[in-house]
């Protein structure tokens, strides 16, 4: 009872301190503070409304309704038309694939194998030839073509349509009999390549990837420009590309079983670790995998206790775990295989439900574990592949028997150089049932999104397997061949798909997106992977092709729809329905992350979706309520067109304001430029020469930009220019859907930093989703211009109703001078007379902090000079204890989101971080041990070095220097996290006491009506030391969500509808095993280890 009375007394005293009416109290009353805030709000809104001319622009749109019509955005109709267009595009590409595959099978069947070729008999263009033809030599039996290249805008590189190009992996000798035969028969594909292009000039890369590693692609283009990337080792192998892996075999359920007994130690253990990592790289997102180790007992190597999807994050977890395994104990194959079969046959978890495989990596042993195979695999539905790793004297018989008796294959990995080739050849075995199935397996598949190796940017690839249809005769019976020749592929750029989903009538917050059966997006405005390599840009990739390419681009860009947006239950439902191929529509309120990823807004969105027939993709259209209609200009009179276009000329900037035009594809012949002045000149010159209705132009786009140019010019001429200079206003601006940005006066426009593409302007998109005036501080940059130079931006969407239809065609605003605002701010919040030291917001007060924050928690105004120098900075870095308390009392809510498309400096990412879209990234520890780069590169050099003893000059293109090695690791894929803060409720006032242990700080806050601002008055942090741990909003490296938890509740997905994993006609007697290493190979291995020792030693010295 006494405690209750004490609590009541304490609360009463606190309330009297905070809201007591007497001017004698130490803290201003809530009524007083609200009166200050109401005056600030009135002054700010009146200033913004008057200076921006928001009402005047509404009047202009209403006045000139005869110059435009209001057209509906019928979401269902739009999404179905776009889906049909995408279906047609992919169908045309599929026809090209079928023609190529049929011709390849026909030509190869007629090809006569030859052991010898006459000099210069095989003619081809080697894509890795130096651009200087004098530096190229042909191998015996072949002759090099020297194409004439031209720069091609479609590919963004040098192209020859007269020839195809051939890429041969570095570790394959191009003069070998196998390669010469492949070159010989695949040359017939060139005519089909050309015919396909004649029928469809929009075709991009057409590629045949051979099971031998040779890749023939059309049109011809140099693989690399050696002047840009000198002395770089080429590690590309077509058989490791995601599209080849997907096309070569049906999905896989793979259990990798690793022997960690005491005999597996030293170099053998290191070889196993690297082999398992390489094996994991042969898996795609349609596959499922886990890794287990065994000695006298068996266990999972990681936290995964069952098969998991072979996406990049999960494979990274497994690789990290494998790198930490140690060897001890004795080998018990029975325990290992029992564990593997139990897990592989567990159907209670998500899995591929197709090829079931056990991959055994061991140094050998005497046990066959026959009873285990009899128990679990009598019907041989599980294939067993065995790998004898390292140099040892064990009898290979037992582990070879395991493979042969279980429809698998036996491989030997005696050294580093054998890893890459032997960890990918199992795909040939898995391809047997597909070949035997014949036409049933001839189904075009479309891949996930990935970065094209030849710098085309983001692409998807249609694939079709190519079979060896040559008959084999045994006992006078014609047996079908079961060898896969390779995979045919045709690329489709995402830019081509985007062109079928026009965006410029949807408003900036409307967009299309598409997903595949894994739920990964192939089309989405937030699909912006950052290229990995030297000199990484600091912004997201927006161009068609990145400037940097790297072997890591082989990995698909797997961004889940629920990671591309802010997840909620309705979006989960939409994703599931899209994967199931259903059509539907949902309208709901959702959180929306801003373009600059600093803010979160709330808005109503309508999602409309439909399947893309003939594919596994599904397409959706997202529209806010204010984009159900759009403006279509009807500038039929050339006089009006000319008058409006005149306002875009730089000579008129003094009168019309500095003008920007969005860089869009207005006309085919109009070159887009990043230089606004240059682009405007080109645009005006083009319009002067050709009318907007020219067949090469998009008349709707041009007429809309001209309409907006005219309307915004009238705002400048008839309103802004007639106003006297308004104190505190540095600039006025108007931005439109049509792509016009006008900044007045001209001088202010010369320092304008916003994106001229209005559809990608963060403040513009935010203004559309908010009914209030949106205040935005410039980015805080210690070394760059601050708020004093650029001012505070205030923006408001122009809202009009035409015949009852809501439109938001533009945003107007001003930039406020910081000094003027400070003067008004302090004047408004000064109390006279002031009876105590804490009764008002005196400038640079020692005892009182007064700040204005925006809805994201960024500082916009303060009564302290050291604060105002930090305008634009997140308040959690300025006063972290207060910001934490504001979150705790629900003034602010927050959302933590992850970016799986980031790149980081090596070592910057957390140790256990999992990059969402990386290929295997070698760590420093890897380099110090064997090193992925060093192994692959060293083996390639050694192989070709020994070959060059017979064929001089072979090594000329494969030199490697320490600087190149270091530079290649300058960036790596990683996950970053960022936290966005937003107002959590509609409460306008709040008060409290911030308890800091030995002291406390009273505070009171008020939101400014019709704005996104909040005023806070608080006792200075200098008077009461508190928690100083910074609260970070900015992007920072992260482990991401715990993958061990994520696999327990995997997201819904669907695998391919068909599976080719077994066939009764399969001949599995060819199951591997060689007669041992001949002396020359032992010699190669000896030199290889010597080189690796030298590389390792020099690396230690460098580090």
Curated annotation (Swiss-Prot):
Which residue ranges does the entry give as Cytoplasmic-facing topology?
1095-1103
Q: Where does the entry say this protein is expressed, by tissue?
A: Isoform 1 is expressed in skeletal muscle. Isoform 2 is expressed in the central nervous system. Isoform 2, isoform 4 and isoform 5 are expressed in neuroblastoma cells. Isoform 3, isoform 4 and isoform 5 are expressed in the aorta.
Q: Which GO terms describe its biological process?
A: calcium ion import across plasma membrane; calcium ion transmembrane transport via high voltage-gated calcium channel; calcium ion transport; calcium ion transport into cytosol; cardiac muscle cell action potential involved in contraction; cellular response to amyloid-beta; membrane depolarization during bundle of His cell action potential; regulation of calcium ion transmembrane transport via high voltage-gated calcium channel
Transmembrane portions of the chain: 1074-1094
The molecular function terms in GO held by this entry are:
metal ion binding; voltage-gated calcium channel activity
User: Where mainly found?
Assistant: membrane
Q: At what positions is Phosphoserine found?
A: 119
Question: PANTHER family annotated for this entry?
Answer: VOLTAGE-DEPENDENT CALCIUM CHANNEL SUBUNIT ALPHA-2/DELTA-RELATED, VOLTAGE-DEPENDENT CALCIUM CHANNEL SUBUNIT ALPHA-2_DELTA-1
The miscellaneous remark of the record is:
Binds gabapentin, an antiepileptic drug.
Subunit-structure text: Dimer formed of alpha-2-1 and delta-1 chains; disulfide-linked. Voltage-dependent calcium channels are multisubunit complexes, consisting of alpha-1 (CACNA1), alpha-2 (CACNA2D), beta (CACNB) and delta (CACNA2D) subunits in a 1:1:1:1 ratio.
Q: What is this protein called?
A: Voltage-dependent calcium channel subunit alpha-2/delta-1
* Species for this entry: Homo sapiens
Q: Which gene encodes it?
A: CACNA2D1
């Amino acid at each position: 009872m006494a405690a209750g009375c004490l609590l009541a007394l304490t609360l009463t005293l606190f309330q009297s301190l905070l809201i007591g009416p007497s001017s004698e109290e130490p803290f201003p009353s809530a009524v007083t503070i609200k009166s200050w805030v109401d005056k600030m709000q009135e002054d700010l809104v009146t200033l913004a409304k008057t200076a921006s001319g928001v009402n005047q622009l509404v009047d202009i749109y209403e006045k000139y309704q005869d110059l435009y019509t209001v057209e509906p955005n019928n979401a269902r109709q739009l999404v179905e038309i776009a889906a049909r267009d995408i279906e047609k595009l992919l169908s045309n590409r599929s026809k090209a694939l079928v023609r190529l595959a049929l011709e390849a099978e026909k030509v190869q069947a007629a090809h006569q194998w030859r052991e010898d070729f006459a000099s210069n008999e095989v003619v081809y263009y080697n894509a890795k030839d130096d651009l200087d033809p004098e530096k190229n030599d042909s191998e015996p039996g072949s002759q090099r073509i020297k194409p004439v290249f031209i720069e091609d805008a479609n590919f963004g590189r040098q192209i020859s349509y007269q020839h195809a190009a051939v890429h041969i992996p570095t570790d394959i000798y191009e003069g070998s009999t196998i390669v010469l035969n492949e070159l010989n028969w695949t040359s017939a594909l060139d005519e089909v390549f050309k015919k396909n292009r004649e029928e469809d000039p929009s075709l991009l890369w057409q590629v045949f990837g051979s099971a031998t590693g040779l890749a023939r692609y059309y049109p011809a283009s140099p693989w690399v420009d050696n002047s840009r990337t000198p002395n770089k080792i080429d590690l590309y192998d077509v058989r490791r590309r995601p599209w080849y892996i997907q096309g070569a075999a049906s999905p896989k359920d793979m259990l990798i079983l690793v022997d960690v007994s005491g005999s597996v130690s030293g170099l053998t253990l290191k070889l196993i670790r690297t082999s398992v990592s390489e094996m994991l790289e042969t898996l795609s997102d349609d596959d499922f995998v886990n890794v287990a180790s065994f000695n006298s007992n068996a266990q999972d190597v990681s936290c995964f206790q069952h098969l998991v999807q072979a996406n990049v994050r999960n494979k990274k977890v497994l690789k990290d775990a494998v790198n930490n395994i140690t060897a001890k104990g004795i080998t018990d194959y029975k325990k290992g295989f029992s564990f593997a079969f139990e897990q592989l046959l567990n159907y209670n978890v998500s899995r591929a439900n197709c090829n079931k495989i056990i991959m055994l990596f061991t140094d050998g042993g005497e046990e066959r574990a026959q009873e285990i195979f009899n128990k679990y695999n009598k019907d041989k539905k599980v294939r067993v592949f065995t790998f004898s790793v390292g140099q040892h004297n064990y009898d290979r018989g037992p582990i070879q028997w395991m493979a042969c008796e279980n429809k698998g294959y036996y491989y030997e990995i005696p050294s580093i150089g054998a890893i890459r080739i032997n960890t990918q050849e199992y795909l040939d075995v898995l391809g047997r049932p597909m070949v035997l199935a014949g036409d049933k397996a001839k189904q075009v598949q479309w891949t996930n999104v990935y970065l094209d190796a030849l710098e085309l940017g983001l692409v998807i690839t249609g694939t079709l397997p190519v079979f060896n249809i040559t008959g084999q005769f045994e006992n006078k019976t014609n047996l079908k061949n079961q060898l896969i020749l390779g995979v045919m592929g045709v690329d489709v750029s995402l830019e081509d798909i985007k062109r079928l989903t026009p965006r410029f009538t949807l408003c900036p917050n409307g967009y299309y997106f598409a997903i595949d059966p894994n739920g990964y997006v192939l089309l989405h405005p937030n699909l912006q992977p950052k290229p990995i390599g030297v000199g990484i840009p600091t912004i997201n990739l927006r161009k068609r092709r990145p400037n940097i390419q790297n072997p890591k681009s082989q990995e698909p860009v797997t961004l889940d729809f629920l990671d591309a947006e802010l997840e909620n239950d309705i979006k989960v439902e939409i994703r599931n329905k899209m994967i199931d191929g259903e059509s539907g529509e949902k309208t709901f309120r959702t959180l929306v992350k801003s373009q600059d990823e600093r803010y979160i807004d709330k808005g109503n969105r309508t999602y409309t979706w439909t399947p893309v027939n003939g594919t596994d993709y599904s397409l959706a259209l997202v529209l806010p309520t204010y984009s159900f209609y759009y403006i279509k200009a009807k500038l039929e009179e050339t006089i009006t067109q000319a008058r409006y276009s005149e306002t875009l000329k730089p000579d008129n900037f003094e009168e019309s304001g500095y003008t920007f035009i969005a860089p869009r594809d207005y006309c085919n012949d109009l070159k887009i430029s990043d230089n606004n002045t240059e682009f405007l000149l080109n645009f005006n010159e083009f319009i002067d020469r050709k009318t907007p209705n020219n067949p090469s132009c998009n008349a709707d786009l041009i007429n809309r930009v001209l309409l907006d140019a005219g309307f915004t010019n009238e705002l400048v001429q008839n309103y802004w220019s007639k106003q006297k200079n308004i104190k505190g206003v540095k600039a006025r601006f108007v931005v439109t859907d049509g792509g016009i940005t006008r900044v007045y006066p001209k001088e202010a426009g010369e320092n304008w930093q916003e994106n001229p593409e209005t559809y990608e302007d963060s403040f513009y998109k935010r203004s559309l989703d908010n009914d209030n005036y949106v205040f935005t501080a410039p980015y805080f940059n210690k070394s760059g211009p601050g708020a004093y130079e650029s001012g505070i931006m205030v923006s408001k969407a122009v809202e009009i109703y035409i015949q009852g239809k809501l439109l938001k065609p533009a945003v107007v605003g001003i930039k406020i001078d910081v000094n003027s605002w400070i003067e008004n701010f302090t004047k408004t919040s000064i109390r006279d007379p002031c009876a105590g030291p804490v009764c008002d917001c005196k400038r640079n007060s020692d005892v009182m902090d007064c700040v204005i924050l925006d809805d994201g928690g960024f500082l916009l105004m303060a009564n302290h000079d050291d604060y105002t120098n930090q305008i634009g900075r997140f308040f959690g870095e300025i006063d972290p204890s207060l910001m934490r308390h504001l979150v705790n009392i629900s003034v602010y809510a927050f959302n933590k989101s992850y970016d799986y498309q980031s790149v980081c400096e090596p070592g910057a990412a957390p140790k256990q971080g999992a990059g969402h879209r990386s290929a295997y990234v070698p760590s420093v520890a890897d380099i110090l041990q064997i090193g992925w780069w060093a192994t692959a590169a060293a083996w390639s050099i050694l192989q070709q070095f020994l070959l060059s003893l017979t064929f001089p000059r072979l090594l000329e293109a494969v030199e490697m220097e320490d600087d190149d090695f270091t530079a290649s690791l300058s960036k790596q894929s990683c996950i970053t996290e960022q936290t966005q803060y937003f107002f959590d409720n509609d409460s306008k006032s709040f008060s409290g006491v911030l308890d800091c242990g030995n002291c406390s700080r009273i505070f009171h806050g008020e939101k400014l009506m019709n704005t996104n601002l909040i005023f806070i008055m608080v006792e200075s942090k200098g008077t009461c030391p508190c928690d100083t741990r910074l609260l970070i909003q900015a992007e920072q490296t992260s482990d991401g969500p715990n993958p061990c938890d994520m696999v327990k509740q995997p997201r819904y997905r669907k695998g391919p509808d068909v599976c080719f994993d077994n066939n009764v006609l399969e001949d599995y007697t060819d199951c591997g095993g060689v007669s041992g290493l001949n002396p020359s190979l032992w010699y190669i291995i000896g030199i290889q280890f010597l080189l690796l020792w030298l590389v390792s030693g020099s690396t230690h010295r460098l580090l």
